[in-house]
Amino acid sequence: MNTRQLLSVGIDIGTTTTQVIFSRLELVNRAAVSQVPRYEFIKREISWQSPVFFTPVDKQGGLKEAELKTLILEQYHAAGIEPESVDSGAIIITGESAKTRNARPAVMALSQSLGDFVVASAGPHLESVIAGHGAGAQTLSEQRLCRVLNIDIGGGTANYALFDAGKISGTACLNVGGRLLETDSHGRVVYAHKPGQMIVDECFGAGTDARSLTGAQLVQVTRRMAELIVEVIDGTLSPLAQALMQTGLLPAGVTPEIITLSGGVGECYRHQPADPFCFADIGPLLATALHDHPRLREMNVQFPAQTVRATVIGAGAHTLSLSGSTIWLEGVQLPLRNLPVAIPIDETDLVGAWQQALIQLDLDPKTDAYVLALPASLPVRYAAVLTVINALVDFVARFPNPHPLLVVAGQDFGKALGMLLRPQLQQLPLAVIDEVIVRAGDYIDIGTPLFGGSVVPVTVKSLAFPS
C-alpha cells in the first residue's frame, strides 16, 4: 500500500484563546497504478496539544505579532519539535481576531517563518464549517445519514453549521459569546463589548452601566443570550437577534435531528466549572443557561467528539505531477499558492453553486483569488463540456474579478475545455488544470510549468480534523 506519513501542526487563533496541536497524519494513495495519485487520510493521531492560552491583543484591538509568535514557538519547544521538522500545517484565525486591522499580515508573516502552511482567515461561514468538522458533527452526520447542527460558542460568537448526511447545508453566525462581558474573579463586570452592552440594554434599559450588574442580573443576561441562540435554531428571530446576526439565517423549515455544542462554552456545557467566574467572563453562566433552557431540553443535544478543541489539527499535502498536454495555461503568472477551492454542490446550477461555495469560504467572488472546481460526476462528453463553458462564461460576466480564471477538474479534458473557452473570454488569463481530485475545504498550490508548459506540479492541501 502506497502510504505517506507527515508531522503536521494546527494553530487556531481565536477571539479569546489560541491553541497549538501537533499531529501525525498517515495518507494512503487510493488511485490505481496508472492514475494520478489521490491521497486520503487513514490515520490522524494527535501527538501533542498545548494548553489553551489567551490570544495576545493590544488595546487598539490588533494582534501582538511578536508575542503571538513567541507563545507559539514555546509550544514547539514544549512538544520537543523543531519548526523545520514539521512537514505541513494550517493556521486558522477566527472570530473577532480575524477582523483585527493586522490579522492577515500578522498570520502570513507567522506562516512564512514557520513553514509551508495553509492560512485561512476565517469569517463567520468558514469558521462555522471548520468548527463543525473539528467537533466531529460532519462525521456524525455522514455516519448516521442524518441532519446534525453544531453550534460552536466561543468568546464573541455562536457559529452554526448544519450538516445533512455529511454535506454542509447551511451556516450562520450570531454575535453572542461567553466573553461579551468580562469580569473579575468575583463576578464584577470590568468591560462590556458592544454586543454584550446591547443585550444588557434590552434586559435593563438603555444606558445601563454593565459594571453595576449584580450576580443575579448576570444570570438574567445569560438567560437572554441562551434565548437568542435558540431563536436562531428555530428561525424565529427577535429584533435583538436580528441585530446580532453576522450572516443570513439557517435554511428555513429544516429541523436538525441532533444538536452538538462545541467551543469554550460547549466545554462548560459538558463540564460545568465549580467557579462560574474562573475564566473572568460569563461563559460558564451562559453554559448553565443553555443547560436550563426548556426548548433545548426538548431537543436531542449530544456531546460532540471535540468541544474546546473543535479545530484543525494540521494539513495533509501531496504533490501531483500532471501528465502530458492535458492542461490549458495562458496569461497566468505562476507559481500561485494557498488558493481555496470552490466545490459546487448543485450540478444543475453551477453558477449558483460556485457562488454558494464561495460564501461558505467567506470569499468575495469579485475580489478574492480562488479556484473553481468542476463536479466530480460530470461526464466526459461534448454536451457536458458545453454546459461547463456556458456556466463559466455566465459566472465571469456576473462576477468580474481582477485575478485569472482558474479551473480544476478531475476529468481528462483540460485542453479541450480551455480551447473552447478561450474565444469567449479573450482578454482573461485562464488556467484549466485537469486530473486533480479535490474535496470541500481543500487548498491548492500551482507550481511553475515544466516540459515546455505542458505540465504543472499541483499540491493539494487538505485540512485535517480530529478523527
From Swiss-Prot:
InterPro entries: ATPase_NBD, EutA, FtsA/MreB. Keywords: Bacterial microcompartment, Chaperone. The keyword Chaperone applies. GO terms for biological process: ethanolamine catabolic process; protein repair. GO terms for cellular component: bacterial microcompartment. Pathway: Amine and polyamine degradation; ethanolamine degradation. Disruption phenotype: Ethanolamine ammonia-lyase (eutB-eutC) is no longer reactivated. Signal peptide: none annotated. It is found in: Bacterial microcompartment. NCBIfam families: PRK10719.1-1, PRK10719.1-4. Belongs to the EutA family. Reactivates suicidally inhibited ethanolamine ammonia-lyase (EAL), cyanocobalamin-inactivated EAL and O(2)-inactivated EAL; requires Mg(2+), ATP and adenosylcobalamin. Reactivation probably occurs by the ATP-dependent exchange of cobalamin. This is Ethanolamine ammonia-lyase reactivase EutA.
